[in-house]
Amino acid sequence: MPLIMALCVIVGILIGTFYANHFSGNRLNIINSGSNRLSNLLHIINDQYVDKVDIDSLVDVAIPQILADLDPHSVYISAKDAQAVADDLKGSFSGVGIEFTIRQDTIRVQNVVKNGPAQRAGILAGDKIVSVDGKPFVGKIVTNEEAMRRLKGPKDTKVKLGVVRYGQKKVKYFTITRGDIPQKSITAAYMLDKNTGYIKVRSFGETTYPEMLIALAQLSQENFKSLVIDLRDNTGGYMNSAVQMANEFLPKNKLIVYMEGRKSPRQDFRSDGHGSYQKLPLCVLINEGSASASEIFAGAIQDNDRGTIIGRRSFGKGLVQQQLGFPDGSMIRLTIARYYTPSGRCIQKPFTAGDTKDYESDIVTRYEHGEFFSQDSIKHQGPAYHTGIGRTVYGGGGITPDIFVPEDTLGMTSYYKQAAMSGLILQFAFTYTDNNRPKLNTFVNMMSLSKYLVQQNTVEQFATYADKNGLKRRNLMIRKSHKLLEKFINSRIIYNIMDDQAWTAYINLDDPTIEKALEVFKKNEAFPKKPSIKK
């Protein structure tokens, strides 16, 4: 990045106009502030410093520090990382279409994208990739970053992979033509029971709304009469996608969200009345990992009394960023406004400019204070507001659910925590899958596979594997954590063999938050009732 570009970012020298992404249609001009101290400093360093200095590196260090002094969500994204960030929200990227893991310094194909380039070329789950374009690719050089660099590439370009198949020694070679690989933001859509549809939204990207319409159409074919939208651990994305999604469920002219900032006049987003599911009973699931666009959707449903929010208090991100790209491919995301739910609340949790440590540890603090386990431990840090029918809601720290569901810690032991945190469960699940792939591939649905895995006593097999790999067997703890261990182990095996939807359906079995939603529908209580007036 040339010196003048660095100065543009740091001190605001005029370099042109950058267009915001989906957060706003307005243009943001970076103008000369009149202060040239940093500009002069960098010129002096470049001209006079005793040793040669990489000015670009200085700038890459300085920009994040400057933005960190504004708020926790104004960030700098290097040119190296910008494409991956864009791909995640765009909904697709160009590559070969495999999901892989690295075991013993070798790429192992974990899953192959259905109808993707790799599958069309003949790559199978379980294959080991040992060379790329005729050059060996094993050993210490194999990292996630390097593997992604070699496998991704422009659409219609070719890459030749050398593969060793399970049970064979001879290397097979496959030439793959790279293509567009979808990154779906909706990872599951199926029926929980004969009346209730379920949709899991992983993130809010460019394709979320059309994906939602497809999912709803599929559920309509099964005559669903109520709907669960699962936003747990959905960290957000494009505001417009959340607005479009909320519009499907709201009657005409209902405020969905509004945004306002020092240089951004208030902008309202309202429903147009064309949504196809305005009277459908609805429950929305959230937790501490639900942020940003997830909170916009949940807030719109809650403040308009359109459905029931179930789970735990959401993250609390109420700031709107505008994305500004630079010619070298890097970009910044600058906070330009706050967003407000229909009742007028900003759900941004408190922060101190320049101090990200406390902000980033907020979720841990909530856990330690008992908020994950008791609704009484929730501390509302903002003022009270009221929904359309007069229910009390709070700003200043996320969306508090209408129905609280504590985290289930039954069976939690130090053995389970070590097994989960060490990565041993993931390693065992992949090894088990690899060793039993022919048999596992014969199962056509999640339920039959899960029943088979229970019969195989995968927990006992894992305990033996873990003991050989540094995690001492603790029989009493293993018995106490048996249900948790079985769920984690078998879910990963199911994921390795099937897909996101099968994995999601499995982990949702006996999920207390899902069960609470089904209970709400059974009692016909999805639409909130007006609070009684105390006399």
Give the positions of each predicted feature.
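Polar, glycine-rich mid-to-C-terminal structural blocks
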Residues: 293, 305, 312, 316-383
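Conserved functional hotspot residues or short segments at active or partner-binding sites
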Residues: 346-347, 351-535
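Hydrophobic membrane-insertion alpha-helices, especially the h-region
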Residues: 2-18
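Extended, small/polar residue-biased N-terminal targeting/export presequences
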Residues: 49-110, 156-188, 508-518, 525-533
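Residue-level recognition of conserved beta-strand edge/terminus positions
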Residues: 132-133, 164, 335, 350, ...
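Cleft-lining beta-strand/loop regions that shape enzyme active-site pockets
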Residues: 21-34, 38, 42, 46, ...
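Structural motif
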Residues: 126-128
